[in-house]
Amino acid sequence: MSWTCPRCQQPVYFAEKVSSLGKNWHRFCLKCERCHSILSPGGHAEHNGRPYCHKPCYGALFGPRGVNIGGVGCYLYNLPTPPPASRISLSPSNFSPPRPRTGLSRAKKGPPYLKTFTGETSLCPGCGDPVFFAEKVMSLGRNWHRPCLRCQRCRKTLTAGSHAEHDGMPYCHIPCYGYLFGPKGVNIGDVGCYIYDPVDIRSK
């Protein structure tokens, strides 16, 4: 029994077939329509019945449109070109003394996502660096590096899904979340509560 390969229109025999998109292909005929890289069955995108690799081809051709995303019809802004080195004079008046460093935190201030030409790679809320698939831990609806998912008070490393949250930031359940945001009252230990010191009984 044989089938016809949708790409080369030659017979496909059972020992050489791969099935994808509801058709049987020769192994080396299942290629991306744009870059012609060999695809694995089920591990590719599809558009109008034709196979495409997910990145970069499908994303560039049919992905979301917008500034710096890279699909058809998007707007790609070029970075400003620096002036040629020959025009810059090297006189001492062009140099400024180094500025002292401030004691700011290491976390970078910036957008929560790093734009790429095929979509978005998220930035870690803990350190501000890109989080790649192999190193990500998903918690609070965002991707984190494993060592960056820490309690905001005691800095203990947390496990995804087994910690408390307040204003989008992670806290360990005990003692930090309870101490900071738990109920207020006698001997609980928060601001505004009454903590009684043990009474020293001295004989007079």
Swiss-Prot record:
CDD domains: LIM1_TLP, LIM2_TLP. PROSITE patterns: LIM_DOMAIN_1 (PS00478), LIM_DOMAIN_2 (PS50023). It is found in: Cytoplasm. SUPFAM superfamilies: Glucocorticoid receptor-like (DNA-binding domain). One of its GO terms (molecular function) is metal ion binding. Keywords: Cytoplasm, LIM domain, Metal-binding, Repeat, Zinc. Residues 88-107 are annotated as: Disordered. Residues 3-64, 122-183 form the LIM zinc-binding domain. It holds the Pfam family LIM. GO terms for cellular component: cytoplasm. InterPro entries: Znf_LIM. This is Cysteine-rich protein 3. The gene is Crip3. It comes from Mus musculus (Mouse). Expressed specifically by the thymus. GO terms for biological process: T cell proliferation.
